[in-house]
């Protein structure tokens, strides 16, 4: 299960860093964006904020684990894991679920990545629900078992 962030800051103040500096997850760079991807539990650590206070924010995608499928020929498919995102304006856009990015400060943000639910291996029982994924106050609910 992948869980990622696009991290950026704005402005040209030379006293402070132009962009947010952060650690955690697998980090990739695309233009002025740093993307932190978590495939398991971890910590997104903001070590330095960018320019003017309040101008720092992160775009986010939080995906929960899907539900496991039901057993036997009549077993239903598991439900998809929940999905939440928010973004800043620019070349990277997100769905209309949230039209604004999340402001961050110089602190640690624990990351929980929800796993998929186990499928049923026998006739009758449902597959297990998927687990929630969490970033700060954003929670995506795990999918229901089939």
Residue ranges and their predicted role:
Residues 1-146:
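Glycine-biased low-complexity/repetitive sequence motifs
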């Amino acid at each position: 299960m992948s869980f990622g962030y696009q991290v950026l800051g704005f402005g040209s103040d030379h006293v402070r860093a132009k962009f947010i500096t952060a650690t955690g997850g697998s980090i990739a760079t695309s233009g002025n964006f740093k993307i932190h991807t978590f495939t398991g539990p971890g910590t997104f650590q903001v070590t330095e904020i960018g320019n003017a206070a309040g101008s720092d924010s992160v775009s986010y995608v939080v995906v929960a684990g899907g539900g496991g499928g039901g057993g036997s020929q009549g077993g239903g498919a598991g439900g998809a894991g929940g999905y939440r995102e928010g973004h800043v304006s620019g070349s990277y856009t997100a769905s209309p679920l949230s039209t604004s990015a999340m402001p961050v400060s110089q602190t640690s943000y624990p990351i929980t990545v929800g796993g998929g639910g186990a499928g049923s291996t026998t006739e009758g029982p449902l597959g297990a629900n998927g687990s929630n994924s969490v970033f700060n106050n954003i929670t995506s609910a795990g999918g229901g078992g089939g």
